[in-house]
C-alpha cells in the first residue's frame, strides 16, 4: 500500500487522498519506516505538495511531514506558513512545526500571536483565527516551555472545597480547626485566611476553589465565558502568584452530553474566555496552570470551580514508587485518622501485606511506633517499599517472604494492614484461603492484648474466620460504597 501511494503521488494522481491515506498507513511502524525510506532515498519529495493549488492538499502534506518529524523540511513548512493565504491551512503548518525544528522562528511566532490576538476577525474568520492562535501558543511553549507561575498564597480570603472521601468529610473538617468548615456532598467547604495551614492536612483528595462572581452559569458557552471573565478569577491569579499574565488553563466539563459534544462546548467556552480576557488567559490542554471545572446540576445550569495546579502538593512526596494494587496514600491517611484512638504509641507494628509501605509510613506520621515490620511476597514491592521509606526518612524492617511462614522472637502489639483482594492475579477462592490462614497467623504473632486494624473488601470473611481464633470485632467503619470496603478493628 505504501509503495502504491508513493507512486500515485509521483504521478500526481489523487494527491490529496493519497496524502491522507499515508497518514493513516504510517500508524503502523513498519509502514512508517518504508515511507521514510522512499523519502531518504530521494524517491519522494513531500515539500512539493506544500505548493499545491489545492488548500486541503497543502494541509495534508504539512500534517504528514509533521507526523514523520521530517526536520529537514522545517524551512519549507515555515515558508509555506508565512505565505499561506487560506486561514484553515495555517493551523496545520503550526501543528507540523511542533514536531520539527521551529526554534529559529520563535520570535516570528510571538509577533504573529500578538498581532493576531488584536485582530478583529469577521464571523467567517473567527473560528480559524482562534485555531491559529491556539496552535501558535502551543508551538511557542513547545519551543520554549513557559515558566510556571509560583503560588504565593498570602493573607487572602479563600473560598475552598476540600474534596474528601464522601463517607467521611467530618475527619478533614475536624483537622481544620476552622469555625467555618462544613461538610457537604463534595467534601468540606471552608472560608479561610489561613490556607497554608490547611494544605498539609493528609485526608483530602484535592483542593478546589469557589471564585466570587463565578459560582454558576447557564448552559451557554458565551454566557459561561462572560461569567468567568467578569468574576474575581483574574484578581485572584494576579494577587496570589509570582509573575505576570498570561496564565494557561483548561476547561473540564462534567455533564450528560456525549464526549464529542462536551469537547466542543469546552472549546467554545475556552475560546470566548481567551477573547474576553484579551488573551491574558490562554487555553492549553498540555501545560495548563489551572483548571476550570464546569459541573452540570439537576437544573441544567453549571457549577463553576477552579483547581490551581500551581499549588504544589508535597504531602505524599515520599511515595514515588508503587504497584498496581497499592493503596493511595490519602486513603491510608484516612484509615489512620479513623483508627488512631486504637493505636498504641511506641508499639511494635506489623504489616504482613505491606506492598510499597504506605500503610506503615502513614501510621508513623500520626502515631509514633517503636519498631515496624513489613512483609510482602513480591520482591518488587519490597524494593519499592524500601525506596519510599527512605524518602519518608523512616525506619521499617522489610522482609520478602510469604507472611504465613514468618516467625519472630517477640510478639507484636498491632497488625495494621490492607488485606489482599480478588484481582486478575488472585481468585476469590484464593482470597478466602488468605483470610482462613490470616487469623491463626495473627494469633501467633500478636501479644495477648494485640490489636488488628485492617482495611478489607471482604467483611464476610472477617466475620466468618475471626471468631475461630478468638478475635472479636471492636469496630467496623464503612470506607467506600462501591465496591464496599471497611476499616475493621479486632482484638
Task: Name each region found by the language model.
Residues 332-410:
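Conserved S-adenosyl-L-methionine
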Residues 82, 98, 113-276:
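Non-catalytic nucleic-acid substrate-recognition regions in nucleic-acid-modifying enzymes
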Residues 8-14, 48-56, 82-88, 115-120:
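Short coil turns that connect the paired helices of HEAT/ARM alpha-solenoid repeats
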Residues 15-37, 59-68, 91-100, 127-136:
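Structural detector for internal amphipathic alpha-helices that build alpha-solenoid repeat scaffolds
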Residues 1-9, 35-49, 70-82, 103-115, ...:
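Amphipathic alpha-helical scaffolding segments comprising HEAT/armadillo-like alpha-solenoid repeats
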Residues 398-483:
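S-adenosylmethionine
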Residues 236-324:
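Non-catalytic substrate-recognition/targeting regions of SAM-dependent transferases
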Residues 319-336:
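Conserved SAM-binding loop and adjacent beta-strand
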Amino acid at each position: 500500500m505504501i509503495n502504491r501511494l508513493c507512486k500515485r503521488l509521483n504521478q500526481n494522481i489523487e494527491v490529496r487522498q493519497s496524502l491522507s491515506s499515508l497518514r493513516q498507513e504510517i500508524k503502523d511502524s513498519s509502514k512508517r519506516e518504508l515511507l521514510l525510506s522512499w523519502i531518504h532515498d530521494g524517491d519522494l519529495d513531500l515539500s512539493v505538495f506544500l505548493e499545491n493549488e489545492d488548500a486541503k492538499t497543502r494541509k495534508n502534506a504539512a500534517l504528514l511531514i509533521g507526523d514523520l518529524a521530517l526536520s529537514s523540511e522545517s524551512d519549507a513548512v515555515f515558508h509555506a506558513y508565512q505565505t499561506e493565504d487560506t486561514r484553515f491551512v495555517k493551523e496545520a503548518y503550526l501543528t507540523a512545526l511542533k514536531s520539527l525544528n521551529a526554534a529559529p522562528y520563535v520570535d516570528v511566532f510571538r509577533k504573529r500571536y500578538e498581532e493576531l490576538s488584536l485582530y478583529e476577525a469577521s464571523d467567517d474568520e473567527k473560528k480559524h483565527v482562534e485555531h491559529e492562535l491556539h496552535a501558535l501558543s502551543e508551538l511557542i511553549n513547545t519551543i520554549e516551555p513557559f515558566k510556571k507561575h509560583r503560588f504565593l498564597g498570602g493573607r487572602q480570603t479563600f473560598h475552598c472545597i476540600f474534596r474528601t472521601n464522601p463517607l467521611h468529610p467530618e475527619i478533614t473538617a475536624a483537622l481544620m480547626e476552622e469555625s467555618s468548615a462544613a461538610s457537604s456532598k463534595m467534601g468540606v467547604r471552608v472560608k479561610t485566611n489561613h490556607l497554608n495551614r490547611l494544605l498539609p492536612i493528609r485526608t483530602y483528595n484535592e483542593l478546589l476553589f469557589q471564585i466570587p462572581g463565578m459560582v454558576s452559569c447557564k448552559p451557554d458557552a458565551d454566557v459561561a465565558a462572560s461569567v468567568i471573565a467578569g468574576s474575581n478569577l483574574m484578581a485572584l491569579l494576579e494577587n496570589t502568584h509570582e509573575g505576570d499574565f498570561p496564565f494557561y488553563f483548561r476547561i473540564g466539563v462534567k455533564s450528560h452530553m456525549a464526549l464529542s459534544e462536551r469537547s466542543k462546548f469546552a472549546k467554545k467556552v475556552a475560546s470566548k474566555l481567551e477573547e474576553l480576557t484579551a488573551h491574558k488567559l490562554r487555553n492549553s490542554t498540555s501545560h495548563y496552570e489551572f483548571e476550570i471545572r464546569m459541573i452540570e446540576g439537576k437544573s441544567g445550569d453549571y457549577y463553576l470551580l477552579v483547581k490551581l495546579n500551581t499549588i504544589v502538593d508535597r504531602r505524599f512526596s515520599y511515595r514515588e514508587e508503587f504497584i498496581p494494587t497499592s493503596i493511595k496514600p490519602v486513603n491510608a491517611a484516612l484509615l489512620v485518622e479513623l483508627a488512631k484512638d486504637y493505636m498504641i504509641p511506641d508499639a511494635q507494628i506489623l504489616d504482613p501485606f505491606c506492598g510499597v509501605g504506605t500503610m506503615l509510613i502513614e501510621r508513623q506520621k500520626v502515631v509514633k511506633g517503636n519498631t515496624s515490620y513489613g512483609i510482602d511476597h513480591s520482591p518488587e514491592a519490597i524494593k519499592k517499599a524500601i525506596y519510599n521509606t527512605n524518602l519518608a526518612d523512616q525506619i521499617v524492617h522489610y522482609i520478602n517472604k510469604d507472611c504465613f511462614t514468618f516467625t519472630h522472637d517477640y510478639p507484636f502489639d498491632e497488625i495494621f494492614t490492607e488485606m489482599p483482594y480478588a484481582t486478575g492475579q488472585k481468585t476469590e477462592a484464593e482470597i478466602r484461603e488468605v483470610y482462613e490462614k490470616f487469623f491463626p497467623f495473627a494469633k501467633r504473632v500478636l501479644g495477648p492484648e494485640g490489636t488488628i486494624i485492617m482495611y478489607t473488601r471482604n467483611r464476610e470473611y472477617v466475620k466468618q474466620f475471626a471468631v475461630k481464633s478468638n478475635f472479636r470485632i471492636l469496630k467496623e467503619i464503612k470506607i467506600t460504597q462501591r465496591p464496599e470496603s471497611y476499616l475493621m478493628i479486632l482484638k
